[in-house]
Amino acid sequence: MFKLINNFFNLSKNDLLKKNTLDIQKNFPVKKIFDAIKSFSDESDIYYVGGCVRKIFCHELVDDIDLATNINPDEVILSLKKNNISFYETGKNHGTITAIIDDKKFEITSLRKDISTDGRHAKVLFSKDWREDAERRDFTFNSIYSNIDGEVFDPFNGRKDLENGCVTFIGDPSKRIKEDYLRICLLYTSPSPRD
């Protein structure tokens, strides 16, 4: 019986996530970007990531969209050009291209792994591995990915931490802070998932 009730509530949460990701499409012309990236090749993919996914789970207003893709920045640029989507190179060396549709900006960042860090900036190597990308993120709730239909990839149980009001580093907190000292500020300024 408990399992049945638990499945009901999990289903309800999943349905809510799907509804909220569809609501994003009503407020943001993001589907055009998903289609552009997916048109690059049969293997290319794109997901919502970070703050926008966290806000969906916390029932907060999504005011900016961060996206992650398994194609490199040059391939992102080719995909956007091919689909007549305006863009600028926000931080191409770090993998970020900003697409612009209807005066709305969407940061698209290629999957990556850190090869060296200096306490603030990292040298990165682009990757096609979603888990590897998640491992370089700061907190578990920022390593949740969602496709356009609301299906979730959550390798570090960030959703559970959100539900429990926890802010949890991925990996060793001391090491993560040494990689990027800004993370200590983010730790103390991260909104509580229970606010």
Residue ranges and their predicted role:
Residues 1-190:
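Catalytic cores of the polymerase beta-like nucleotidyltransferase superfamily
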